[in-house]
Amino acid sequence: MARTTPLERVRNIGIAAHIDAGKTTTTERILFYSGVVHKIGEVHEGNTVTDWMVQERERGITITAAAITTAWTKRDPQNPTQPMPGALEHKINIIDTPGHVDFTIEVERSMRVLDGVIAVFCSVGGVQPQSETVWRQANRYSVPRIVFVNKMDRTGANFYRVYDQIRDRLRANAVPIQLPIGAEDTLRGLIDLVRMRAYLYKNDIGTDIEETEIPADMQEQADEFRTKLVEAVAEADDVLMEKYLEGEDLTEEEIRAGLRQGTIAGTIVPMLCGSAFKNKGVQLLLDAVIDYLPAPTEVPAIQGTLPDGTEVERKADDAQPLAGLAFKIMSDPYGRLTFVRVYSGILKKGSYVLNSTKGKKERISRLIVLKADDRIEVDELRAGDLGAALGLKDTFTGDTLCDDSAPVILESLFIPEPVISVAVEPKTKQDMEKLSKALQSLSEEDPTFRVSVDPETNQTVIAGMGELHLEILVDRMLREFNVGANVGAPQVAYRETVRKPVRTEGKFIRQSGGKGQYGHVVIELEPGDPGSGFEFVSKIVGGVVPKEYIGPAEQGMKEACESGILAGYPVIDLKVTMVDGSFHEVDSSEMAFKIAGSMAIKDAVMKANPVLLEPMMKVEVEVPEDFLGSVMGDLISRRGQIEGQTATEGIAKVTAKVPLERMFGYATDIRSNTQGRGIFSMEFSHYEEVPRNVAEAIIAKNKGNA
């Protein structure tokens, strides 16, 4: 089957932002104007296309990254409600990502497979902590982006304040290509700084737009920002810079070409504005997606590794060997959906592919593309396409799918560690079986959701990125899998580490008639770098310990560290060097060395000044200034460290680092402390040593439970 849309006319984009910036509404309007839906969905009515899970519709937030395919033809500048004569249709694959920090993995995995992003900002709230997180994720994968300043109809809307915040807080070269005409309830149109024309909206559904002169009272401001736009474009291109310095005007085509070049290179971030809810600015936003965001052929070719370790790249080309990345798993009435971004080659229905990450062959039974709740079966996915495959049993998030004849492994995803856990217990024997199925299915879908069994209590423990994350997963267990379960109170994911180097040994000898047991290791332990986990090095020479016993000794140490030594929490950031030992020709065994390794590490950790670490959260609180004192006092009482405060138009913003252990239930507390007028956001920052008095209480409690 031939390609229906040339690669140059494909856009793979994400819509990302902080919670409540209006991403889902923006997506709904895009689907409405591009003809995917014929009735506008509203978040507050719970009938949007991309929020299709029950939990999403109830809470009015997006949890999973919904993938949708649509099409757009550029509008006629003289009549923006109609396609431009002679313009060609573009295919747009859109991922609507969640803004709540507990669902960061959804943003992370969508950034990995996108070519461009629309970053949506609220014109009132501006740059929020989650905006910074999303921006960092886009930076990590060098994703070009355009900005849409939304909610310009809201009280307190200020386009220019958001412009300053993006430049100052995100250190981005934001370049407005539009200015709003009016704001709040007087928002009536937009100025196009590329064409230097105005668009006035004559109705509230965006179907009657008049192209006209720039209002006289805004001409000076428009000229000022037009100059900034031309300067930014000239800086992105030497030829345009030369023309600009010689005093010549740049044409519309040159400005667009320079903006495109700068956006794709990451040196320019075009800024647009409007109100998705009031249907203003959406068609022009879609035009900007086509004008400024890259096609799959315009981003760097995906990097991969061959089986022999050689670095290789795969270009976006149907003729190249197949290379695709599984970026999401989802349970569905259709079966297990594996979302795939095809980077090169063609993925065909009914074909066998190699999962090079696992070294296993898989059969693609069916392929579908999604329009949220609608699943459309297709015969193939080509280079640059996003879609979902059915029939894959061993493929998980981050795995590479490729041709068996041309194996390659693509770079996987960055997956953050969970910071909060709860114990779950099935209510009945029947629930026990259902619970294990539910947990397996949910952990396949979400790599930040971890399941383990506490060896002391035999309880099943689930861990995730925050209270809301676990709350929604437990809710899904009850609703989708019909599991009756009792859920314990949230527990903090503490860690243990060491502060000084030591040398010690572990010797396991058992003689009780017949074959004995003998294992002996000598180790040096030292603190590792933050984030280094458990590092093991063997410096055994001369066969003092045979090679076949070094692995089991390491395994014994690793398992002891995973179980915890000081208070039962995993030991991290330490380097262990095995320097000596001894063995017995007859009595030594792998098990004896595993036990000796475990004994050595336990002794070493207890002698190396062990400490407890706790997750610290970056907390940002916004409250009316009248409540500032009580909110700051409350944060300090939670062992918080205040890092900064600002005030704008009667609203105070406080940033602090606070231990996660002291933030449980904070959502309820801040509501009662501020008469329901305070809001806060929280994300994981780093691990920090627990104060001695607090640590002693935690250790004593854990030893009492043992």
Curated annotation (Swiss-Prot):
- The principal localisation class reads cytoplasm
Q: Which UniProt keywords apply?
A: Cytoplasm, Elongation factor, GTP-binding, Nucleotide-binding, Protein biosynthesis
Pinpoint the tr-type G domain residues: 8-297
* Single GO BP term: ribosome disassembly
Q: Where is the signal peptide?
A: none
- Could you tell me where this protein is found in the cell? Cytoplasm
Q: Cite a single GO MF annotation.
A: GTP binding
Alphabetical GO CC annotations of the entry are:
cytoplasm
Entry's InterPro entries? Answer: EFG_II, EFG_III, EFG_III/V, EFG_IV, EFG_V, EFG_V-like, EFTu-like_2, G_TR_CS
Amino acids binding GTP: 17-24, 96-100, 150-153
> What Pfam families does the record point to?
EFG_C, EFG_III, EFG_IV, GTP_EFTU, GTP_EFTU_D2
Family the entry assigns: Belongs to the TRAFAC class translation factor GTPase superfamily. Classic translation factor GTPase family. EF-G/EF-2 subfamily.
Q: What does this chain do?
A: Catalyzes the GTP-dependent ribosomal translocation step during translation elongation. During this step, the ribosome changes from the pre-translocational (PRE) to the post-translocational (POST) state as the newly formed A-site-bound peptidyl-tRNA and P-site-bound deacylated tRNA move to the P and E sites, respectively. Catalyzes the coordinated movement of the two tRNA molecules, the mRNA and conformational changes in the ribosome.
Q: Which PANTHER family match?
A: RIBOSOME-RELEASING FACTOR 2, MITOCHONDRIAL (PTHR43261:SF1), TRANSLATION ELONGATION FACTOR G-RELATED (PTHR43261)
User: NCBIfam families recorded for this chain?
Assistant: EF-G, PRK12740.1-3, PRK12740.1-5, small_GTP
Identification of the protein by name: Elongation factor G
Q: Give the organism the record lists.
A: Cyanothece sp. (strain PCC 7425 / ATCC 29141)
Q: What taxonomic ancestry is recorded?
A: Bacteria, Bacillati, Cyanobacteriota, Cyanophyceae, Gomontiellales
